């Protein structure tokens, strides 16, 4: 029988719950940095964030929302978005699919001018 996984987020350590623990359906990571500086969409993958400390700002097509500790944001597939950390130290959990984790890794190792092509490979697109 599977066991629950409990991660203590006190202190400065970065901890994660990976694929093996979730049956390869999603991953949970503690992050501190901003997302891409462009509005983008994932056509087939949902994504969520839970702010642990500080402020995380989300930009959508028609609005910008500032979130603080204790706030959870769920972005279903097909919803254009981006997010960023402005100012104070921020810690948050990001809950994403294996495909989105692979996309992030690919973007981090690719020059900015090639991000559009990389996004297409992962059923995603840059909008602005």
Predicted regions and their residues:
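A short glycine-rich, His/Asp/Glu-containing loop-to-beta-strand
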Residues: 3-40, 45
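Short strand-coil-strand connectors
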Residues: 10, 59-63, 86
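Ligand-binding loop in jelly-roll beta-barrel domains
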Residues: 22, 69, 77-102
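Short, charged/polar surface micro-motifs in flexible loops or helix N-caps
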Residues: 22-24, 34-36, 55-57, 64, ...
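A generic structural motif
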Residues: 34-36, 46, 53-55, 78-80, ...
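Short acidic-glycine-tyrosine-enriched beta hairpin
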Residues: 48, 62-80
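Double-stranded beta-helix
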Residues: 88-128
């Amino acid at each position: 029988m599977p066991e629950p996984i409990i991660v203590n987020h006190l202190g400065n350590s970065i901890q994660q719950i990976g694929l093996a623990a979730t049956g390869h359906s999603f991953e949970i990571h503690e992050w501190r940095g901003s997302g891409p500086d462009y509005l983008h969409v994932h056509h087939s993958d949902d994504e969520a964030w839970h702010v642990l400390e500080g402020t995380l700002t989300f930009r959508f097509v028609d609005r910008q929302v500032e979130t603080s500790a204790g706030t959870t944001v769920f972005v279903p597939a097909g919803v254009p978005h981006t997010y960023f950390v402005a100012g104070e130290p921020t810690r948050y959990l990001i809950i994403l699919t294996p495909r989105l984790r692979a996309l992030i890794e690919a973007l981090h190792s690719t020059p900015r001018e090639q991000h559009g092509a990389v996004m297409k490979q992962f059923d995603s697109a840059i909008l602005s």
